């Protein structure tokens, strides 16, 4: 198969919750980072994902991201440490979805970072490490470009291009007296994570009744859909995206440039954010 498609990378067989998933994904990510092709953004998709945006729309959105990393942000769960409990990780850990939008500059840094290699080794002994990697890498930016926090012999930051401070966002969620927005559309994104739309009810497979809501969402892809469970939902969404690809609509990505992580990366302070309330929910919110 690889002789027919030279860019096809085949990983090892892996099981849910184990390091094998992260290992396979990271090896593909590293392969792409070392290519001479001048790609601009990496976007993860699984076999049960479907795009919600056309190529034209994705390009405009990724231009609006302006070099920032887009990953989900949630507190790390203590039961995931397993045998590593009590052993300091190379950087503070955060929980995130596997789906991430990563600029090329960040990819180039990550695959050459010794600290990232140490993080991968650490996570290989933890539970569901694929949901602990991206924001642990992207969410440990220093306060300023010249400041590095050190505790003992442990450096607590990563200078990844496009990164942000996840701990500040988690703190705001706990202390900000605001209501999260109900509207989440391409004209008013309403969230700070667009990597993937997913309903967290025991990994719910989306069906026909979900389609009207899914079509209006601002995310790049939807998870999960299956041709073995209400296949009409899969085909309806696919047909809609194909139609828009051949008949482009007026698409303005301005709202994506107003996402909090994009504005924080561009230099705005927390108090200067256009939509601070967009920080209040992660994709793990059930609602």
Residue ranges of each PLM-predicted region?
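ER/Golgi luminal nucleotide-sugar-dependent glycosyltransferases, focusing on the catalytic module
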Residues: 1-287
